[in-house]
Curated annotation (Swiss-Prot):
This is NADH-quinone oxidoreductase subunit C/D. PANTHER family: NADH-QUINONE OXIDOREDUCTASE SUBUNIT C_D, NADH-UBIQUINONE OXIDOREDUCTASE 49 KDA SUBUNIT. Its EC number is 7.1.1.-. It comes from Buchnera aphidicola subsp. Acyrthosiphon pisum (strain Tuc7). It catalyses: a quinone + NADH + 5 H(+)(in) = a quinol + NAD(+) + 4 H(+)(out). Residues 1-190 are annotated as: NADH dehydrogenase I subunit C. The gene is nuoC. SUPFAM superfamilies: HydB/Nqo4-like (SSF56762), Nqo5-like (SSF143243). The keyword Ribosomal protein does not apply. In the N-terminal section; belongs to the complex I 30 kDa subunit family.
Length: 600
């Protein structure tokens, strides 16, 4: 058993615990399991982090799951290589750690459970008995760190190819290709890779036949148009009926979390745009907010309003593509061409403000890159006058079509309990009747100052209800944009804090000290104090978040990117078993995902 109480700064730790003793769940844990078996880490995440020994993991999970106000959703699960982390004297001894991020809907609060591990004992019990969505998260943690989860139903690689060697998020695994031998794919290696892609049903617990039927196995993807990206689903079929299926991801993996370890806090911003490549500035927001927490930077009001305005423009842009491609998947072509015309109007506005279109990389640590250009309000007003009438066209000509309704209502249904079990967020969760929208429940960037409604469904999430939720969300985003237009404050667009990156040019030209700071922050990167922070936002496809660990350097020690599309695809088999292939196509169109968001 690992000693959870660090030897240094014991007085400080007791003082910190006393300051946070009003948190009832911490008291409940300490009372039930004993203070000597739990260590409370104080961070800037905004929720308690409790370190426990791995022998208590399942019991602690059950305890939190069965509280009167339970922690019902496993939001995230991943690992950290602690071996070269600086300034961790106040933490339990660990070579690696695994964290379990849980959410209580009734409390509207989170808790993170951390388990320290030594390098010679990287074994944990699986969490899949409590939370079925732990399956993929544990597979990815093994894939990236080599941590074994006992009794996992299928602990195999999920992001990297089955032939891959090593665990990429370990600190001794180089992030640069120049440190490896040049890649060469000879015929023998190519055969090996092709063999690795062959689907073997027995490895997934599937039978090739039963007493009466010999099943057919069909590859849908990884380049099928209805797969919406480089994504493969292997279907076990009895005729047209889906007996079971296995989603296969990882084809779009780019090592986004690894890249964060070799980019400065500032230079990583362009990479965030490409996590969910349709979201643009929406992707930048949780990252810069998390860095600002670490740096203790307060953002000017004008910058907050600009960030909200840009986020809602990209939300509408993404939703329009989703709605039109959903209609196309059901069989209607025309709306997708109209949608691209409407999205062009949004891109014209975004380009006028940021100078770029899909990936502006425009938010900054402490604000935004530039002030709004002259005439931005005219372009925005023209769009606000145009879009509501256009949205009615989509509804009346396509979404009220009896064939579309028949093909999507009652298809791929799940309820609130099932959604929470699988970590579903966004429109899929709200269609079950739960109005969990981070902008309302946990406001950020000034969203508490805006008037808007959260569209919800009647209790069952199906393909039709999910798409109609998105339609209503466009109306609400238009209402938020109108408030931004009418109430845009004056003042600076960037904080004057010394850690704001880059510093304002006006200050740089005034004194040599600011010039030196500017030079260091642009060339070397800002030095962010050691701590941990977390920020979730309501992104275009659900909840997106960044969990950052700084050890006092110019680069992140660990960047964990939790995206909504990853759990949404994991849920597919539980929803679609017993349905037809044609139903799967409609279901995939109703999820709203892109593979860059899944694979990172």
């Amino acid at each position: 058993m690992i000693d959870l109480m660090p030897k240094k700064n014991t007085f400080l730790l007791k003082k910190k615990y006393k300051e946070d003793s009003n948190n009832s769940v911490i008291n409940d844990l300490f009372d039930f399991f004993g203070k000597e078996f739990c260590f409370h880490q104080i961070t800037l995440t905004g929720f308690p982090i409790i370190w426990i020994d791995k022998t208590l993991l399942i019991e602690v999970g059950k305890f939190l799951y069965h509280l009167s106000q339970p922690y019902i959703m496993l939001y995230d699960l991943h690992g950290v290589d602690e071996r070269i982390r600086l300034h961790r004297e106040d933490l339990p001894k660990a070579d690696f750690s695994v964290f379990y991020h849980l959410i209580s809907i009734e409390r509207n609060s989170d808790i993170m459970i951390k388990v320290p591990l030594l390098e010679n004992d990287l074994i944990l019990p699986t969490f899949t008995g409590l939370f079925p969505n732990a399956n993929w998260y544990e597979r990815e943690t093994w894939d990236m760190f080599g941590i074994i989860f006992n009794n996992h139903p299928n602990l195999t690689r999920i992001i990297m190819p089955s032939t891959w060697k090593g665990h990429p998020l370990r600190k001794n695994y180089s992030a640069r290709a120049t440190e490896y031998e040049p890649f060469f794919l000879n015929e023998q290696k190519e055969d090996l890779e092709m063999e690795g892609l062959k689907f073997k049903p027995e490895l997934w617990g599937m039978k090739r036949k039963n007493d009466n039927v010999e099943f057919m196995f069909l590859n849908l993807g990884p380049n099928h148009p209805s797969a919406h990206g480089a994504f493969r689903i292997v279907l076990q079929l009895d005729g047209e009926n889906i007996v079971d299926c296995v989603p296969d991801i990882g084809y779009h993996h780019r090592g986004a979390e690894k890249m964060a370890e070799r980019q400065s806090w500032h230079s990583y911003i362009p990479y965030t745009d490409r996590i969910e490549y349709l979201g643009g500035c929406v992707n930048e927001l949780p990252y810069v907010l998390a860095v600002e927490k670490l740096a203790n930077i307060s953002v000017p009001e004008k910058a907050e309003v600009i960030r909200v305005m840009m986020s809602e423009l990209f939300r509408i842009n993404s939703h329009l593509l989703y709605i039109s491609t959903f209609i196309q998947d059901v069989g209607c072509m025309t709306p997708v061409f109209f949608a691209f015309t409407d999205r062009q109007k949004i891109y014209d506005l975004i380009e006028a403000i940021t100078g770029a279109r899909m990936h502006p990389a425009w938010f900054r640590i402490g604000g935004v890159a530039n002030d709004l250009p002259q005439g931005w309000n005219i372009l925005l007003k023209e769009f606000l006058d145009w879009m509501p009438k256009r949205l009615k066209y989509y509804i009346n000509t396509a979404l009220k079509n009896s064939i579309l309704i028949h093909r999507s209502k009652g298809i791929a249904e799940y309820n609130k309990k099932e959604a929470l079990q699988w970590g579903v967020t966004g429109a899929g969760l709200r269609a079950t009747g739960l109005n969990f929208d981070v902008r309302k429940w946990r406001p950020y960037s000034g969203y508490q100052n805006y008037t808007f409604e959260v569209p919800v469904g009647s209790g069952i999430s199906d393909c039709y209800s999910r798409v109609m939720i998105k339609v209503e969300e466009i109306y609400q985003s238009l209402f938020i944009l109108k408030q931004c237009l009418c109430n845009m404050p004056s003042g600076p667009f960037k904080s004057e804090d010394s850690l704001t990156t880059p510093p304002s040019k006006e200050c740089v030209l005034q004194n040599i000290e600011t010039m030196i700071t500017h030079f260091l922050q642009v060339s070397w990167g800002p030095v962010i104090p050691e701590n941990e922070s977390f920020q979730m936002i309501e992104a275009t496809k659900g909840i997106n978040s960044y969990y950052l660990i700084s050890d006092g350097g110019t680069m992140s020690y660990r960047t964990r990117i939790r995206t909504p599309s990853f759990p949404h695809l994991q849920q597919i088999p539980s929803v679609i078993r017993g349905s037809l292939i044609s139903d799967l196509i409609v279901y995939l169109g109703s999820i709203d995902f892109v593979m860059s968001d899944v694979d990172r």
